[in-house]
A protein has these predicted regions:
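C-terminal and inter-domain tail/linker signature
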Residues: 1-132
Length: 132
């Protein structure tokens, strides 16, 4: 159940790194919701696989290369909280950007139903009812 959800989240990140959108969205509910933190350039809630995929692809536009690496995954019922390392290199630059964010996935019937993104990893853990 929850361990299966953890493995689904891992496979989504692996597919993201390959830019394999079919695989990345295969285990997501057709009505999946992606909620980004307030204050960002495209903050808000995106609904449905296509809208979520469009958001992700637009987010990637300024970068020549980018990868995500789940450093820690915590299962809590039908949720998976993630401490995620994001590495990116902007186009026309040799600068490397590395940040850590939090993500909270919610599942229903083996499908990712929602993803909430947090600028601070500990906020995702708090939202899941977990503490470090």
């Amino acid at each position: 159940m929850s361990q299966e959800n953890v493995e689904i989240v891992r496979s989504i990140y692996e597919a993201f790194n390959r830019r394999d959108w079919d695989a990345a969205f295969r285990d997501q509910h057709p009505d999946v919701e992606l909620t980004t933190p307030p204050g960002g350039p495209r903050s808000g809630t995106y609904r449905g696989r296509l809208e979520c995929q469009r958001y992700v692809q637009e987010w990637l536009t300024p970068f020549e290369a980018s990868t995500v690496e789940p450093e820690e995954l915590f299962e809590s019922g039908d949720q998976v909280a993630v401490v995620l390392k994001v590495q990116a290199r902007p186009k026309d630059s040799s600068a490397e950007i590395e940040i850590r964010i939090g993500q909270l996935w919610a599942f229903r019937d083996g499908k990712a139903l929602s993803l909430r993104i947090f600028p601070e990893p500990e906020k995702a853990l708090e939202a899941a009812g977990l503490s470090e």
